Amino acid sequence: MFIGRERELNALEKLYTSNRFEFAVIYGRRRVGKTALINQFLGGKKAIYFMGIESNAKQNLENFSKSIIEYSSGIETETSFLSFQAALEYVFKLAEKERLVLAIDEYPYVARSSKSLASTLQLLIDKYKDSSKLMLIL
């Protein structure tokens, strides 16, 4: 059961309805319901959900690639993007056509495994912020 968090859900919904690039960061102590909030918000929306793991960049990229490809093709596959930049750019381009949410849960794990991820995100946000309808949640 999902209780409380109406204020946070309303804030996310407001960003979602803008239909332009939006960026939200959900943070807080462990075990306070951040993942439940994200899952509740994503219900019924076109969304790619990826949960980072405490592992290496290769494993996180493989898992992220699976999430993206499963969303875009509906098929589970072992195919992987060659880099986080290629994977993220693909998502930004998908979102040029329609509103799409990308939620990267446990982002710190992914960022620790890939030192260039933050600067890659900044580069792509700068490149696509005016043309993409992506809502990015970290």
Language-model features: locations:
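Phosphate-binding site recognition
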Residues: 1-138
